[in-house]
Swiss-Prot record:
Family listed: Belongs to the UPF0114 family.
GO cellular component: plasma membrane
Database matches in PANTHER family: UPF0114 PROTEIN YQHA
Protein name as catalogued: UPF0114 protein CGSHiEE_00455
Pfam families per the UniProt record, alphabetical: UPF0114
Membrane topology: Multi-pass membrane protein
Species this protein is from: Haemophilus influenzae (strain PittEE)
InterPro entries hit by this protein: UPF0114 (IPR005134), UPF0114_bac (IPR020761)
Chief location: membrane
Protein location: Cell membrane
HAMAP family assigned to the protein according to its UniProt record, in alphabetical order: UPF0114
NCBIfam families linked to this entry: HI0507
Length: 183
């Protein structure tokens, strides 16, 4: 005798929903070209660093100490932007696309063992403040050649970065303490 199974009225809906969920989940791979583009950008900054260092070395005898300091600050700026690119590339890929699976690699940076969106946001904001600080140093070393209005706007922008980072850290602290309260 044939057994009557109840017909699931939502079976077709569940199947379509599952397909949509798979498409949405797979869409994260569309970010891969963006991260590869950041690697190309990192190569451009590596070239810029080598070129800047070479120019500093071959022209050192013709430079005064302020010009040398500006050249060094420019190199530090390039390094900090390169570090920012590495953090965004590795952290973003690991958080949003797929795990890198480098847990046992001897050269794995320490911060990768606990990378998450919150850690990445804090590291990014600190990097931006560091880059902004380098720009501020360059501005003040070269203050005699800078319009006062430009210096004021750079200072205000830097203060804005600082306030944003403090607000972000405070918000993360509140969220962390709220989510870890014992009842």
């Amino acid at each position: 005798m044939k057994e009557n199974k109840p017909v699931d009225p939502y079976a077709k809906y569940n199947e379509q929903s599952n397909i949509i969920a798979k498409i949405i989940f797979a869409s994260r791979w569309l970010q891969v070209p963006i991260y590869l583009g950041l690697i190309v950008t990192l190569a451009i900054y590596s070239y810029k660093f080598i070129k800047g260092l070479w120019e500093l070395v071959i022209n050192v005898n013709d430079m005064d100490s302020n010009t040398i300091m500006l050249g060094v600050l420019n190199l530090i700026d390039v390094v900090m932007i390169a570090n920012l690119l590495v953090m965004v590339t590795i952290g973003g890929y690991e958080i949003f696309v797929s795990k890198l699976r480098t847990r046992n690699h001897p050269d794995q940076p320490e911060w990768m063992s606990h990378v998450n969106a919150t850690v990445l946001k804090v590291k990014l904001s600190m990097s931006i403040i560091g880059i902004s600080s380098i720009h501020m140093l360059q501005t003040f070393v070269n203050a005699s050649n800078m319009p006062e209005k430009t210096m004021m706007w750079q200072l205000l922008l830097h203060l804005g970065f600082l306030v944003s980072a403090i607000a972000l850290a405070y918000t993360d602290k509140i969220l962390y303490s709220t989510s870890h309260k014992t009842h």
